[in-house]
Swiss-Prot record:
The keyword NADP does not apply. Residues 432-441, 618-633, 689-703, 1026-1035 have a biased composition (Low complexity). Keywords: Methylation, Phosphoprotein. The modification Phosphothreonine is found at T666. The modification Phosphoserine is found at S260. The modification Asymmetric dimethylarginine is found at R1044, R1157. Disulfide bonds: none annotated. This is Uncharacterized protein C6orf132. Transmembrane segments: none annotated. The modification Omega-N-methylarginine is found at R1073, R1084. Residues 322-331, 501-514, 566-583, 920-931 have a biased composition (Basic and acidic residues). Residues 126-468, 484-771, 790-823, 847-1039, 1069-1160 are annotated as: Disordered.
Length: 1188
């Protein structure tokens, strides 16, 4: 028996099977088979067993049956193979794995390449640092590198350790870049990329293919590495440098992960450090930045490596940003990174240099631009940001374009884009696009443009696969738009997104401050924009670089007063520039935010500036915008990359332009870049901004579309402005140059916003398609989006966000943005939290509760007067008060969530509710007209939009144009589309969808949009959202059903994409949303489903609309219609839970916005037999209700 037990025990240990024969099966290890000793103790003394065997102290159960619980010994059995003694010694602990000493030696001694390979894995090993320190060898090359430029020299020597390598490396690539800018950039950089990617990569080119794909971070690093080498193109050591860089970069680049960490950590430290150097002296900043970076970066890199996993998708940007920033900062800080120090300078420097094969050119230009340093600094900063932050990164090129003088930096910006490209594949696509766009748009910086193109092309070519990969990733990021946003705007996001947000708000404010520092704070539309944009980007870049400092610092540095004052200035200026178009908006934008919104419309940059204040006020919006921008850029990038990448030259203006504008507006946060780039480089700005905008525009579009919807519908004038913009946009699209010029003249920002807006006529398509695809789902969003897009094809979306959202959000952004700011900021640490992070969700929820209700009421009400739409939006965003006032308590219930998510969703959700609620009421009032006009105007642009988003937008665009007369028709169509789409892409249960941002409207919309049932009760929800009674009447009678569906669907979908991180992450529905684009996910998913959805969904939607049009019936009828048409089964469910829920939704949903918010209707749609998420909504409705 004992033996048997022992044997059994052994086998049990080995096979995890207890001897069945023994009673030791009991909880107590009477004779635990796993204990060999047990047998002996059993045989001998129980005491022995107990004593001998740690866990089975007592062999005999009787002795201590309880004491000898198998539970613990069970663990030990894992070590059954070990002798009991050994087991006892080990307990269950496995010998502590120890890194072989080799690693340290290897890493330290080994070539950076090898070490890096290992180092990446073993980031904790100090050798990584030694490897990088080993790069000091690279430092010597930098001395030769100094030739590129004194700033670089300064940077190089100071930056010596990390940067020298890039300079060294740079020489070969720069010549290549210089000689064959496009190919060399592409070709030479690949080696650097290889080198950067991994020392071995330098050694083994084969790795290059893999590294690009392999290294989302590495490519950024690679780009960083290659760009840095290009930066010090002059560096003679270039030949050796590549390897050195390979080695050196490899430690930074090769050890992509920790390099990213290094970039992040070092950069943050560097940024922090650099932030002082930043202003002190660019050269010194460069030197300081690099020096601190080398030390900080490498030391910090040790710590950072663990995060590497996240970095892969989000950090690449940061890596690229920071590594290049760092390197560039060191290399290029002195030259052009005046405002933004090392951090930003580094990267643009690398990329500027890479962009500008000739470092001298870059540095020279940078130096030459040194006087224009603010600009160049901005440009580079923007370039840096672009490289550094995908969302900002895209703006980077824009800054460059805006800054012809910094044109050299622009190319560097382009290279940063490559960094961004690699770093952020979504942006990468944009990067390419921006680069290509930049070249296309940057004829001015043609020299850079070639290099830019080279950079762009190299990056593009370098990542031809990367391009595909980027597109794929963009799709993935679109799916995970938020995620990427979270990543981009998370890593960079918190840094870039939050800081871009903050940087765009704060950095932008700092930018303003920087501009203030740079005198051209608001002063020159062009320069301020550039300076502001650049500075903003620089600051934003700095913000990304100085993640916390920037965020904390910028907000402090650029206090709201500054924002206010700048905002006033911008308002004044925008009044002139934006008054052109924004005057209606302004008229409609009684609230400053409104004005600002209008201006944002017109002056994405200007308004961005305002938005900066607004951003300040609307950190959420900014955040949303930035992340949204990031998202949208991705969204755009996915579709826009092809459109943009494909028609970069042709469409870039459009795609780029309007994206630039939306980016501008969208990038309201990032808009400074866009604004800067937008006006000056509408294309590039749009291209880059398109990237940023695409990324940002997704959420931004969502937000902006929401805002625009809000503004547009809520702000009839805004909408008219939007229409005006839309029409002008179309006219401008046609007369984009003129408008762009005019706006640029007015203010680069305004131009940026409007040029895109103007361009949006032509380039609005992307915007439309972006927001449209994005929010196209929202038929009114289509209308709005289209108007938004139409109004500011780019500026519209961007500006709508800024305008609508700023109008709505600025008013409510204080609530919304502040909440977002809070949302973004960790309550304890004050750090910017990732968008999708649990803390962010918690903060968002808390903010929603607090601000949605308190600020929501105050802001919503406050904004309310400003523009119904706006206030509605705000109310919605702030929602609580307005959702009730809106008559869609449910609707606005969501808004409370929205306040925090207001930027995220509130823009969309709010917009939707606004569009629905205010729009319903307002539709009745004239929003409908406005909307119709918007729709009408968007219609042309819708075609443009769908032109771009042909499949996605086309249905939406066409539905809009088709049913344009009767928004309900477009709404219907959209609803149908949306519903169809919703049916197709059924978002996750609202709880999941909403978790990230539980905004009810967004959620409801999401739910609605998510699932046709939700859409069905989206009607209901819309009703609840917009006001069960009014929305049905208005929404359903009008396009609200459609708009709601579109809005709910599109918005929801968008929300799903933008709003619900969880949904986006976890759910296919959301991913659908995301994959299409942010817009694709939202718009494309909606759009695409809309495309095919209108036919299938059309009848349903129409039915719904019919039902929906009957205001009373609309609630139920649409629900039933949609239900019956779209969900026969769902209807049963709807009816059972849905009917009740619907009754509840209208009743409970209406009265309790909570229900609406939680989508009592969502409850209804909990179970959808035929859908992807059959049980999405029951939980949702009930859950939300319960939650509510």
């Amino acid at each position: 028996m004992k033996k048997k037990q022992t044997v059994q025990g052994t086998f049990s240990k080995l096979f995890g099977k207890k001897h069945t024969t023994t009673p030791s099966t009991s909880l107590y290890a009477t004779n635990p088979p796993w204990i060999f000793t047990q047998e002996a103790p059993e045989e001998g003394t129980g005491g022995f067993d107990g004593i001998y065997y740690g866990d089975n102290r007592f062999n005999t159960v009787s002795e201590s049956g309880t004491a000898t619980l198998k539970a613990r010994p069970r663990v030990r059995p894992l070590l059954t193979f070990l002798p009991l003694n050994a087991q006892e010694n080990h307990g269950l602990a496995v010998p502590t794995p120890s890194v072989p000493d080799d690693f340290a030696d290897k890493e330290v001694t080994g070539t950076s390449s090898l070490v890096n390979g290992n180092l990446r894995l073993y980031s904790s090993v100090g050798d990584l640092r030694p490897g990088q320190y080993g790069q000091d060898l690279l430092i010597p090359p930098p001395p030769p590198g100094p030739a590129p430029g004194p700033p670089q020299d300064i940077s190089e020597p100071p930056g010596g350790s990390p940067l020298p390598s890039p300079p060294s490396t740079a020489p070969p690539p720069p010549p290549l870049l210089l000689e064959p800018p496009p190919p060399p950039s592409m070709a030479p950089p690949p080696p650097p990329v290889l080198e950067a990617l991994s020392p071995p990569h330098t050694l083994s080119s084969p790795s290059i293919p893999t590294p690009p794909d392999f290294i989302p971070p590495a490519p950024p690093l690679a780009f960083l590495a290659p760009p840095p080498p290009p930066v010090p193109a002059p560096a003679p050591p270039a030949p050796a440098s590549p390897h050195t860089v390979g080695t050196r970069l490899f430690p930074p680049g090769g050890v992509t992960k920790w390099k990213s960490d290094v970039a992040l950590n070092g950069r943050q430290a560097e940024a922090t450090r650099a932030s002082p150097p930043r202003s002190p002296a660019e050269p010194k900043g460069s030197a300081l930045g690099p020096n601190p970076e080398p030390h900080l970066t490498f030391p910090r890199s040790f710590k950072v490596p663990p995060p590497t996993p996240v970095r892969t998708s989000s950090i690449p940007v940061q890596e690229a940003q920071e590594a290049p920033r760092k390197e560039e900062g060191a290399t290029k800080k002195a030259p052009s990174r005046l405002p933004l120090p090392p951090s930003f300078h580094i990267r643009p420097a690398s990329q500027v240099y890479p962009d500008r094969a000739p470092e001298p050119d870059c540095p020279g230009e940078l130096k030459a631009t040194a006087p224009a340093s603010p600009r160049l600094g901005q440009s580079q900063s923007q370039a840096d940001e672009r490289a550094g932050t995908p969302p900002p990164a895209p703006p980077l090129p824009p800054p460059a374009p805006p800054l012809p003088p910094p044109a050299p930096p622009l190319p560097p910006a382009a290279p940063p884009l490559p960094c961004a490209q690699k770093a952020a594949h979504p942006p990468a696509g944009f990067t390419k696009t921006p680069k290509s766009s930049s070249p296309a748009l940057k004829p001015k910086p043609n020299p850079p443009s070639p290099e830019n193109t080279a950079s762009s092309a190299p990056v593009d070519w370098r990542d031809p696969s990367q391009m595909e990969k980027l597109r794929n990733e963009l799709a993935a990021y679109l799916c995970g738009s938020r995620r990427e946003d979270r990543f981009l705007s998370h890593r960079p996001g918190p840094t870039v997104a939050p800081q871009s947000k903050e940087g765009k708000k704060g950095p932008r404010l700092p930018e303003k401050e920087t501009l203030l520092s740079l005198p051209a704070k608001d002063t020159p539309p062009g320069v301020p924009e550039k300076s502001l944009g650049g500075s903003s980007l620089t600051e934003t870049e700095a913000a990304p670089s100085l993640t916390l400092p920037s965020v904390d610092y910028i907000p402090q540095d650029s206090p709201t007063p500054s924002v206010r004052q700048i905002r006033n200035e911008l308002e004044a200026r925008l009044s002139s520039a934006a008054e052109k178009e924004a005057k209606p908006s302004i008229g409609s934008l009684p609230p400053k935010p409104r004005l600002e919104g209008g201006r944002i419309c017109e002056n994405g940059a200007d308004d961005d500036k305002l938005s900066k204040p607004v951003a300040k006020n609307l950190p959420p919006q900014s955040t949303t915008l930035l992340p949204t921008t990031s998202l949208q850029p991705k969204a755009m990038l996915g579709p826009a990359i092809p459109p943009k990448a494909t028609p970069e030259p042709a469409i870039p203006p459009k795609a780029t332009l309007w994206p630039a504008t939306p980016p501008k507006a969208t990038l309201g946060p990032a808009t400074p870049l866009k604004a800067t780039s937008g006006p000056t480089t509408p294309l590039k700005a749009t291209s880059g901004p398109a990237i940023a905008s695409t990324a940002t525009t997704l959420p931004t579009t969502t937000s902006q579309l929401m805002a625009e919807k809000d503004s547009g519908p809520a702000g009839q004038p805004e909408k008219p402005a939007s229409q005006e913009v839309s029409t002008p946009s179309q006219a401008r699209g046609e007369g984009s140059p003129s408008e762009a010029t005019r706006l640029p003249t007015q203010g680069a920002r305004s131009s940026a916003a409007f040029p895109p807006k103007t361009s949006p006529g032509g380039g609005e398509v992307p915007c439309l398609y972006k927001p449209h695809c994005h929010q196209s789902s929202l038929s009114r969003e289509v209308a709005v989006v289209m108007p938004t897009l139409a109004r500011g094809g780019a500026a519209g979306p961007g500006e709508p966000v800024e305008v609508k959202e700023p109008p709505g959000l600025p008013a409510k952004p204080p609530a919304s943005a502040q909440p977002t700011d809070e949302l973004l900021r960790h309550p304890v640490t004050g750090e910017v939290v990732e968008r999708g992070s649990p803390m962010a969700l918690l903060l968002a929820a808390r903010q929603r509760a607090q601000k949605g209700r308190s600020v929501g009421a105050a802001l919503g009400r406050s904004s309310l007067p400003g523009s119904l739409r706006d206030h509605s939006h705000q109310a919605e965003a702030s929602s609580d008060s307005i959702f009730h006032s809106q008559g869609t308590p449910n609707s606005f219930t969501v808004v409370p969530k929205l306040p925090k998510e207001a930027e995220k969703d509130s823009p969309l959700t709010t917009e939707i509710p606004n569009k629905w609620g205010p729009r319903l009421g307002r539709d009745a009032e004239g929003t409908e007209l406005s909307r119709r006009h918007n729709w009408t105007k968007p219609e042309p642009q819708a075609p443009v939009a769908w032109e771009r988003v042909a499949p996605s937008n086309l249905p939406q665009g066409h539905p809009l144009p088709k049913s344009f007369s009767s928004p309900p028709s477009p709404s219907n169509k959209r609803e149908e589309e949306e519903e169809e789409f919703n049916f197709e892409v059924i978002p996750p249960p609202p709880e999941f969808s909403n978790d990230p941002e539980p905004p009810a409207p967004a959620l409801q919309y999401l739910g609605r949009q998510s699932s046709p049932p939700r859409n069905n009760y989206s009607d209901l929800r819309q009703l609840p959202n917009a006001g069960p009674g009014a929305p049905p009447a208005l929404g359903f009678s009008r396009f609200p059903a459609g708009a709601r569906y579109a809005g709910a669907g599109g918005l929801e979908r968008f929300s799903g994409g933008g709003r619900s991180l969880i949904k986006k992450r976890l759910y296919v529905g959301e991913p659908h949303r995301g994959p299409g684009l942010p817009h694709g996910g939202t718009g494309r998913s909606l759009s695409s489903p809309n495309c095919f959805g209108p036919q299938p969904g059309g009848p349903e939607m129409r039915r719904v609309n019919s039902a929906g049009r009957a205001p009373p019936g609309g609630l139920h009828a649409p629900r039933l219609s949609l239900e019956g048409a779209a969900r026969g089964a769902a209807e049963a469910k709807h009816k059972a839970p849905g009917s009740a829920d619907y009754g509840f939704a209208p009743a409970a949903g209406r009265s309790p916005y909570t229900t609406t918010r939680y989508g009592s209707p969502i409850n209804t749609f909990t179970v959808r037999p035929g859908t992807r998420h059959p049980i999405s909504y029951v939980c949702s409705g009930a859950h939300r209700k319960a939650t509510s």
